[in-house]
Design a protein with these regions (language model features):
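Glycine-rich His-Gly loop
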Residues: 8-12, 86, 109
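Active-site signature of alpha/beta-hydrolase-fold catalytic machinery across serine-
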Residues: 21, 94-95
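Alpha/beta-hydrolase active-site loop
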Residues: 53-75
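Gly/Ala-rich beta-loop-alpha elbow adjacent to hydrolase catalytic centers
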Residues: 83-88, 92
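Flexible "cap/lid" loop of the alpha/beta hydrolase fold
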Residues: 101-136, 175-183
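Conserved alpha/beta-hydrolase catalytic His-Asp/Glu region
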Residues: 141-176
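Conserved small/polar residues in nucleotide/adenosyl-binding loops
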Residues: 190-192
Length: 192
């Protein structure tokens, strides 16, 4: 029997409503879909931005986020198809390693630990979110200029503004840092 449930996993800095059009598409094709928010992020993008700096969001860690999605998946009647973007793509890989998905799609995934680039563009985009030399008790909210550079550099200015208003939210610096830790390491299960 083919799975009929899809779980969408959001990346960092982006509200889970970014999956709304994807959900509609797959629901029209007969799938059940979920796009659960990350812990402490079940509010509108505007409300989350207005809550910045948010110590609860700042406390999120990659391992607890992976466990959050594991709990959601284990409550489902079947192993779902997993689709994730960025850190969500990395989470998809880890969940598949744990046998918690029937299939997975990682869109522009953050790579597992041990795979890194030192390109200037990557370092520029990642320096602020990594939050070195700043308090990890404060969430990080990209400025519009950082959003333009790191997320929407191929879009016209109006689309960039719309994307920022509709989707940009504060993030935990610890989650971004954790992508460099053992929490982000694949454990070697076969890939197809």
């Amino acid at each position: 029997m083919s799975p009929k449930t899809i779980v969408f996993i959001t990346g960092a800095f982006v509200h889970h409503s970014c999956w709304d059009e994807w959900k509609k598409y797959f629901e029209r094709a007969g799938f059940n879909t979920l796009a659960p928010p990350w812990p402490f992020k079940d509010a509108s993008p505007e409300a989350l931005r207005n809550s910045h700096p948010n110590p609860e969001i700042a406390s999120n860690r990659l391992a607890t986020l992976i466990d959050h999605y594991e709990r959601i998946i284990k409550q489902l009647p079947e192993n779902p198809i997993l689709i994730g973007h960025s850190i969500g793509g990395l989470i998809v890989q880890v969940l598949l390693q744990r046998g918690l998905g029937s299939a997975g799609v990682a869109i522009h995934s953050v790579p597992p630990r041990g795979i890194i680039t030192f390109k200037a563009s990557f370092l520029k985009a990642g320096w602020g979110p990594l939050g070195f030399f700043t308090s990890t008790k404060r969430s990080f909210l990209m400025s519009f200029e950082q959003w333009q550079y790191a997320f929407t550099n191929g879009m016209d200015c109006e689309a960039q503004k719309e994307g920022y208003y509709n989707y940009a939210i504060p993030e935990s610096k610890l989650i971004v840092r954790d992508t460099l830790s053992k929490a982000a390491k694949e454990i070697g299960r076969a890939h197809v």
